[in-house]
Curated annotation (Swiss-Prot):
It is an enzyme of class 3 (hydrolase). Signal peptide: none annotated. The gene is BST1. This is GPI inositol-deacylase. It comes from Candida albicans (strain SC5314 / ATCC MYA-2876) (Yeast). Involved in inositol deacylation of GPI-anchored proteins which plays important roles in the quality control and ER-associated degradation of GPI-anchored proteins.
Amino acid sequence: MLSKRLFPYSNLFPRSRKYKFIVYFIICLTIIISALGVYLYSIPIVSPNQPQCDMVWMSPSYARIRAFDETHTKYASKYNLYLYREQDVDKMPNENENEDGNEGFTSLDGIPALFIHGNAGSFEQVRSIAARCSEMYYNDGRFKEKYPHARNIDFFTADFNEELSAFKGLRDQVEYVTQAISFIVDLYPQNPNRNIILIGHSMGGLVARIAASRQQHESNVDIILTLATPHSDPFPWLPKTSDFPDEVGLISIYSSVDLMVPPSVVTPKSKSDHFFSVDAAKLLGVPIDHQGIVWCGQLREKLSEALIGISGLNTLQDRMKVFKKIFSGDRKELGPTPIFGLAKLKLKLLQSWVHLLSLTIFALKWTIIVLAIIQLRKVYTKFNNPPPTH
């Protein structure tokens, strides 16, 4: 009788069964989710029979612009600036310094363009588009007939030493690019418009946008071409780009199968009057990943033609017309990248990481705020209700 009173088994067993059910449920749910994850991982996003990007070849060379030193920017010891030259095609700069110390770069007679690589990227990623532009202008007579006012393009490229711009260094890169724009434009005194084309890949597109907003009073930038750039400011810790000037044209090229920068973040929250975007994977009918967007053969053909087409035009309206004509032309023979069923589900899940990260940061921020308010309330209550004295 005593043991029954001390240990009420009738109350303990139901609770034990309840806990076991919860444990079993969690284990089964984990197994199901893991099995589903393994199964989805084994499913290819695109069919192996799907047409792929054409491989490209070039003969790159890079001339470092040492004249862009500490007298022009305090980041000269941290970053570098190069001029791309396609071997046996482009005119090589004179290695002998002139009286200005610009190593012969003042003899350049083309249209300047500045390439800005992305997070942990390389300045050499400019080579694919730059090489094709040189071939089109110097060796392909079709484009000279199609664009009689075209000029050759001098591609400059910024080297951030593979810096993680998605997490740090973005502000330094913006200041460096802003100063580089002014330096490059001064190399072209014969250019009456003093304009430069900015090309940014991934986070480099954000650097270009912010730098262009700082250059607004000088009007050195009138068009920006971005490749797989998250324009909607998905990362709260980075500088915002909402102050983008309306006088600058913005072309956003992205891929619907990009896992790093999904289509949901490629459109800026506040569009300018001259904004244009296109899904390159859908337009060309080939899967293009985040890195492939700078070298994919089919895409670089259109990008290079567009750049050659706008090189001899002076007004922003005319330049935007060229881009829209090339990227919104006849699509009868082209089609979307075929992704259906579970492959599409896998793609959406993999692309949702940006939104999950934003929600996590949002939840952490408000958790810290609520905890701080609770602690302040406790302190306030403690000081306004002192303990009674005896």
